[in-house]
């Protein structure tokens, strides 16, 4: 088994890491940063991912997708999805199966398909660093993700060309990273994870058992639709209201203005973590018949806190429930770990400190800890690391609907996984030939108030009075937190394996089609990158040869000059077309035409009479390109991004 990388697929930013020896390496992307914006843009038949997508978001808001993780595994009619529709500039559409998808240029895309583009970027980042192909990964998800959301995340990995060896919960991954440097003694930690789109809290016990670190999750709770994006939205709503009050113009319907507001709000929020006030200044935000309008608003830290205090307070409820479920008191918590970029907000830190009665630790990087923990779990799965044991739990109760529409639990929340539990059911009518079982996940007593995972039918039950058939149904949750069901008719001994026919999610055929699409795009991307490379080579060669001709004008005959200039013209014409081989051929023709000239130049200079390699003229241009890459990467990034999107 090769390296198993760890990927934190975040709502706002993503991160990739790998275990090297006994240390975790957070891998920098092609732009030189350790985290990558979880943004995907579709522009002129090109897919941009990360920073390049973020840079053009203001001018392409309808085709720039961000916070797609909030839609993964969700139904279009979910209240939280309906709320998001009014908050994002891109179109959220209803798929044929009722799922929430997005629509770009009239084409519907599934959230796992979009998330796969981010995973591909992470995969390529790791491959560039390791110098080898990467096919296996551990991917993290919010602890409170349900079965559909976990399966959709695995689908995204599959589309990206990754075998997702394990799905692990984000707070658990952060605890693994924290525990790496904590070698002695037992401790109980609370992981408070407030990311871009989700909130989780987990109570985790770390024990030293015969030299092996054992991480046991005692309880977890959270909210999969509460995060930094909501803090941004609260600030955006305030700015829109202030502008309406000042200019009597509503910016809500202007997608370009709203995208500029989003960027400004995010920037202001970050600045207010260290400053007491900041100014949002957006000239020419819009215009009407009276002329252009400018938005200038000064925001204080206290104003931001008043706008978002309710959001912070919402995180306290899950903290209380997690402690109760774990059966421990606040005083039993040894350390509090903050994870997720939103925890940098002073108000969040203050409220967490007040709740747990202690200052949270500052030695865990909130942006990188989750990816680091995923990399540690990857090393465990590959056999590279053997002194860590992870015992996680299922965050939500699993059960079925019984008479009266009540949810009958089969596996209670916070049950350690993997696990398998069974319960015996029977028929409700005489001679009933089949039973239909509705499977739900959630904490509500009324079955249909929970997330329906699907249904299955057990058929061919022999005729018998009601209540007599004994049908044992087993719920089996694997280490990823994903469920399978089997059933046995105890009267006949007939066993049957049941696959949940989910009402939502991608079918195997859809996933396979998306993989084929990704592979086709990969070929196109590679062709585009190769074409760009050979065009750059042609451009550099033409420049170098023209300079040499000018410098050696007195040594070159008219025939030689005409021959070289004709070759240059043919190469310039070829470079405007899309034929890679033709450009290469014209490059070679220019080299051959220039060879007699180069021999003259170097003979006169006392160099070897064998002539020079025309590529030497190109060397300076190549080196110049390398030196620029570390600066602004405005030019180079476009080509880098194409390579990053190889599928």
Curated annotation (Swiss-Prot):
Composition bias type Polar residues, residue spans: 615-628
Region of interest: Disordered: 606-634
Listed Gene3D superfamilies: 1.20.1270.10, 3.30.420.40, Actin, Chain A, domain 4, Substrate Binding Domain Of DNAk, Chain A, domain 1
Pfam family, one: HSP70
Induction description: By stress conditions e.g. heat shock.
Protein name according to UniProt: Chaperone protein DnaK
Residue positions where Phosphothreonine is found in the record: 198
GO molecular function, one term: unfolded protein binding
InterPro entries membership: ATPase_NBD, Chaperone_DnaK, Heat_shock_70_CS, HSP70_C_sf, HSP70_peptide-bd_sf, Hsp_70_fam
UniProt keyword terms in alphabetical order: ATP-binding, Chaperone, Nucleotide-binding, Phosphoprotein, Stress response
Main function: Acts as a chaperone.
Record-linked SUPFAM superfamilies: Actin-like ATPase domain (SSF53067), Heat shock protein 70kD (HSP70), C-terminal subdomain (SSF100934), Heat shock protein 70kD (HSP70), peptide-binding domain (SSF100920)
Record carries keyword Nucleotide-binding: yes
Family as reported in the entry's similarity comment: Belongs to the heat shock protein 70 family.
Statement: the UniProt record of this protein carries the keyword Transport: no
Highest rank taxon of the organism: Bacteria
């Amino acid at each position: 088994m090769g390296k198993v990388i760890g990927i934190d697929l975040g709502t706002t930013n993503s991160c990739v890491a790998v275990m090297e020896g006994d240390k975790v390496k957070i891998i920098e992307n092609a732009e030189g940063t350790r985290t990558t914006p979880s943004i995907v843009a579709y522009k002129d038949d090109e897919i941009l991912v990360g920073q390049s997508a973020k840079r053009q978001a203001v001018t392409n808001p309808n085709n720039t997708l961000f916070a797609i993780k909030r839609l993964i595994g969700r139904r279009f009619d979910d209240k939280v999805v309906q709320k998001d529709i009014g908050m994002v500039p891109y179109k959220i559409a209803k798929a044929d199966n009722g799922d929430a998808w997005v629509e770009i240029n009239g084409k519907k895309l599934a959230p796992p398909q979009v998330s796969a583009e981010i995973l591909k970027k992470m995969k390529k980042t790791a491959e560039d660093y390791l110098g080898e192909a990467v096919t296996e990964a551990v991917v993290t998800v919010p602890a409170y993700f349900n079965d559909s959301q976990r399966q959709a995340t695995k689908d995204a990995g599959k589309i990206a060309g990754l075998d997702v060896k394990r799905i692990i919960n984000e707070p658990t991954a952060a605890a693994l990273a924290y525990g790496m440097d904590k070698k002695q003694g037992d401790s109980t930690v609370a992981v408070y994870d407030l990311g871009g789109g989700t909130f989780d809290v987990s109570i985790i016990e770390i024990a030293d058992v015969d030299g092996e670190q054992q991480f046991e999750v005692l309880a977890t709770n959270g909210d999969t639709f509460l995060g930094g994006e909501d803090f941004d939205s609260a600030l955006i709503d305030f700015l829109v209201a202030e502008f309406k009050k000042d200019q009597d113009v509503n910016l809500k319907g202007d997608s370009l203005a709203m995208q500029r507001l989003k960027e400004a709000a995010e920037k202001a929020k970050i600045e207010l973590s260290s400053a007491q006030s900041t100014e949002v200044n957006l000239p020419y935000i819009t215009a009407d018949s009276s002329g252009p309008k400018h938005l200038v608003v000064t925001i204080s830290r206290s104003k931001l806190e008043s706008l978002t205090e309710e959001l912070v307070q919402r995180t306290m409820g899950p903290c209380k429930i997690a402690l109760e479920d774990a059966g421990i008191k606040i005083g039993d918590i040894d350390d509090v770990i903050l994870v997720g970029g939103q925890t940098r907000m002073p108000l969040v830190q203050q409220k967490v400190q007040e709740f747990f009665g202690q200052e949270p630790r500052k030695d865990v990087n909130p942006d990188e800890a989750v990816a680091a923990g995923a990399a540690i779990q990857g090393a465990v799965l590959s056999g590279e690391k053997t002194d860590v044991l992870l015992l996680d739990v299922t965050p939500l109760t699993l059960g079925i609907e019984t008479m009266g529409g009540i949810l009958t639990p089969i596996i209670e929340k916070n049950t350690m996984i993997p696990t398998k539990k069974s319960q015996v059911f029977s028929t409700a009518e005489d001679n009933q030939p089949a039973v239909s079982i509705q499977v739900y996940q959630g904490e509500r007593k009324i079955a249909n108030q929970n997330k329906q995972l699907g249904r299955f039918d057990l058929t061919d039950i022999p005729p018998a009075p009601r209540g007599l058939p004994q049908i044992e149904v087993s719920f089996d949750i694997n280490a990823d937190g994903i469920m399978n069901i089997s059933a046995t008719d105890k009267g006949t001994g007939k066993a049957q394996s049941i696959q949940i026919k989910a009402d939502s999610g991608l079918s195997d055929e859809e996933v396979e089609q998306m993989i084929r699409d990704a592979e086709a795009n990969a070929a196109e991307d590679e062709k585009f990158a190769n074409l760009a490379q050979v065009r750059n080579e042609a451009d550099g060669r033409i420049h170098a040869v023209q300079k040499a001709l000018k410098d050696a004008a007195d040594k070159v005959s008219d025939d030689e000059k005409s021959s070289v200039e004709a070759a240059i013209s043919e190469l310039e014409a070829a470079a405007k077309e899309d034929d890679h081989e033709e450009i290469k051929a014209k490059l070679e023709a220019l080299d051959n035409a220039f060879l007699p000239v180069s021999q003259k130049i170097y003979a006169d200079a006392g160099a070897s009479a064998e002539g020079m390699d025309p590529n030497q003229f190109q060397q300076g241009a190549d080196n110049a390109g390398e030196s620029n890459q570390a600066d602004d990467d405005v030019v180079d990034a476009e080509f880098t991004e194409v390579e990053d999107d190889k599928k």
